[in-house]
Each structure stands twice: as structure tokens, then as C-alpha cells.
Amino acid sequence: QTLVNVRLASLAGWQDNPRLARRRDEAQAELGSEGRVLIRASGTEPVLRVMVESADAGRSRKLAESLAEAARG
């Protein structure tokens, strides 16, 4: 499991980020039934929590960083 915290200026509209949505769908498709992707907003600070679970730690880390970059971008 890999967790990346992505600090943003504001969480407003993060769910509507098409780049993040596309990358999330691609990551989940890559993992298939062998892993999962979870992205949620922190309840206490302007941070997105990006979590990727997979048996392959390197793959989880790579996908989580890619999702974090999409969230920033």
C-alpha cells in the first residue's frame, strides 16, 4: 500500500479534475482485480489522500506518484 498526501491551495472542485479522473481510471484498469485506487479529501486540511494498493510495492508507488502529479496539475 502506498499513500501520498497532496497539498493543494484549495480542495474546491478536485472531484471535477478531468486529468485526475482519467489517470485514476487508467491506474485502476492497470491494476485490475489485483489492486485498488482510493482518492479522498482530508477532513481537516487542504490535502488529497491518494492511496494505491497492490502486491507490487514499486507499481503502487509509481501509480500513486502519477496520480499525485495529475492532482497537482
Q: Where are the regions a protein language model picked out?
A:
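Phosphate-binding and adjacent anionic-ligand microenvironments
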Residues: 1-73
